[in-house]
Regions:
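Surface-exposed, glycine/proline- and aromatic-rich loop segments on solvent-exposed faces
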Residues: 274-279, 287, 295-420, 478, ...
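A solvent-exposed, charged loop/short amphipathic helix patch at secondary-structure junctions
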Residues: 17-44, 123-135, 169-182
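An active-site-proximal structural segment forming one wall of the substrate-binding cleft
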Residues: 1-12, 41-63, 89-101, 193-201
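Conserved, mostly hydrophobic/aromatic
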Residues: 4, 53, 109, 160, ...
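Short, well-ordered beta-strand segments enriched in hydrophobic/aromatic residues
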Residues: 263, 313-322, 460-468
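Aromatic-rich peripheral "rim/lid" segments of glycoside hydrolase catalytic domains that contact
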Residues: 173-176, 186, 197-274, 282, ...
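Glycoside hydrolase catalytic-domain groove-lining segments
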Residues: 87-175
Length: 556
């Protein structure tokens, strides 16, 4: 037990309502803590809460250092170019609360500070103009510098800092310090840079967020696609940045059942029962009887075999040629996915192909730089919400008929349109293509490991993994997908018993092809399986921590 941090990231409107309703409240004065004459009613109430804590501690003959939780949204600084009213609406100032001489353990200021939010971190000129001691532009360091100056006389700690190794992203940050879409190695590098800033600006410590990934978290741009919300802990959404901040990852499945995209077949052999020998057969049958084996479905096509499997985070595809090697871009692989009855039997992105039964998504593998996952326009929640409902997208393509065959880039929002109040600068709506499929190896022991990779091909082996949300699943543990948003008028989850997978290989002169599906179904689950692994960021940070084992005197 090192100390107490009291409170949470204060909701600014709750602070304002409290202050407005209690303007006649006198500053609190207790035996161990008091509010200063400048304290707001909310700050005075916080002083009284520290008093409650202090008295409780002393019942056990203890005193520990204490702080009030805070974050940039309710900091005591001024941010005149912050576009979102609530991000600079009120202040909660730790300097307006102080310990009395009876409290010996100390009092410090605590802030959760991330580099990509609020927007003033990215657009406020005073932070953009700030230079570190090395002469580099660094808004995060600029903010820390101003915060340190305000809290003169008391210790100041960044009690949350970090970045996410999610496959998805929620916000862009300066210097590429985005909320998500970082490899594990990039996560380690950025976290090391943030710690350097905390150290160089003379703060008294930093606590990394977080130790491990947290499946239960949600983010503003994916939360509506996770239904029901109370089942988030059952599966890992790799598109939700908030779930992937840890330096310890918890991939779905046991370590023995993990599928790596690496061009090798041993992991798939383990799942499909292709282990050699009588012993392997007996072990496999035993595993199946005990329910320890993930589902796998297989189907033979003209020139290749398809296997499909899954875990708590991904759907996996394994396509193996019976002769020869995959040849991109001379060959093109298109895989349609039918998550609901109906959909389009044609796709404008894949002329010449027919998908009986209809599809909502189309995976297109053309090579390392030209591969995408497309979404049926009528099924696209992004264009429905930000194009039709809110009008944020310029000239959105809106085709409400799921049979029309219009497929769009799979996109996620990053920010709504902004107008900066001081400069008058207008910032347009921001989004990005999450459906751009990344080529790479996902085996952590491989020197070429890429934690953001979606597919890999080597020789006659092609492997793909797709996060569940990118295939329309709101909860794979109960086989729920979202319904057509234009028809439902909202994001509504419906149950679908199976997934139709339509693989096709096209090359010059193929002509018309009608693709028969592999139908994939699986049992739902109420107990997720996972294992723990140290991310690459863990090793990077463990080395950096050795250089920051003491408080540094500010360089300025």
């Amino acid at each position: 037990m090192l100390g107490w941090i009291v409170g949470t990231e204060w909701f600014p409107y709750a602070v304002k309502v409290t202050d407005d309703a209690n303007r006649s409240l006198a500053p609190y004065s207790g035996k161990y803590f008091r509010a200063t004459a400048e304290a707001t009613p909310f700050e005075s109430w916080l002083a009284s809460m520290l008093e409650v804590l202090a008295k409780k501690e002393l019942e056990y003959a203890w005193q520990h250092p204490v702080a009030l939780s805070n974050w940039p949204t309710t900091d005591p600084l001024s941010h005149p170019d912050e576009a979102n009213e609530q991000e600079d609406l009120v202040s909660v100032d730790p300097m307006h609360v102080e310990p009395t001489s009876a409290w010996k353990a100390g009092y410090f200021a605590s802030y959760h500070i991330y580099p990509a939010y609020p927007d003033f971190m990215r657009y406020e000129e005073k932070y953009q103009d700030y230079r570190t001691v090395e002469g580099k532009s660094d808004p995060y360091a600029g903010y820390l510098n101003e915060l340190r100056a305000h809290h003169e006389g008391i210790p100041l700690m960044t009690t949350e800092y970090g970045t996410s190794s999610a496959r998805g992203m929620a916000h862009r940050g300066f210097l590429g310090r985005n909320q998500g879409m970082h490899t594990e190695a990039e996560q380690g590098r950025i976290n090391a840079e943030l710690l350097d800033d905390i150290y160089d600006e003379g703060l008294d410590g930093g606590i990394l967020f977080s130790w491990q990934d947290e499946w239960f978290k949600f983010a503003w741009n994916t939360g509506d696609l996770e239904v029901p919300a109370n089942r988030r802990p059952m599966w890992l959404n790799r598109l939700t940045n908030e779930q992937n901040y840890g330096v310890i990852t918890e991939p779905g499945e046991s370590i023995e059942e993990t599928i790596h995209l690496d061009g090798k077949t041993d992991d798939w052999d383990e799942r499909t029962g292709s282990r050699s020998g009588f012993g392997g057969l007996v072990e496999r049958l035993s595993d199946r009887l005990l329910g320890r084996v993930p589902e796998v479905r297989q189907r033979r096509y003209e020139d290749f075999d398809l296997s499909v499997s899954h875990d708590e985070a991904y759907l996996y595809l394994f396509l193996q040629k019976r002769e020869g090697e995959w040849d991109f871009p001379d060959e093109e692989i298109n895989v349609g996915f039918g998550t609901l009855p109906g959909g389009s039997t044609k796709a404008d992105k894949a002329p010449g192909l027919t998908f009986p039964g209809g599809i909502q998504f189309l995976l297109q593998i053309r090579g390392e730089k030209g591969s995408h996952l497309w979404i049926n326009s009528a099924y696209d929640p992004h264009t429905w919400l930000y194009g039709e409902q809110l009008g944020h997208m310029p000239d959105p393509v809106i085709e409400k008929d799921p049979r029309a065959g219009v497929f769009l880039p799979w996109r996620l929002a990053l920010n709504r349109p902004l107008e900066l109040p001081q400069s008058g600068r207008k910032i347009p709506f921001e989004d990005y293509e999450v459906g751009r499929m990344n080529f790479g190896i996902t085996d952590p022991s491989d020197p070429e490991f890429d934690s953001l990779a979606d597919w890999y091909a080597e020789g006659g082996v092609l492997e793909v993994r797709i996060p569940w949300t990118m295939l329309g699943y709101t909860d794979p543990s109960t086989l729920r997908v979202w319904d057509y948003p234009y028809e439902a008028g909202k994001i509504e989850a419906v149950r679908n018993e199976d997934l139709r997978v339509y693989p096709a290989v096209q090359s010059a002169g193929n002509g018309q092809i009608s693709v028969e599906p592999l139908t994939y179904a699986w049992k739902g689950w109420d107990q997720p399986t996972y294992h723990e692994r140290k991310k690459k960021s863990y090793t990077i940070l463990s080395e950096v921590f050795e250089d920051h084992d003491r408080v540094k005197t500010p360089l300025r």
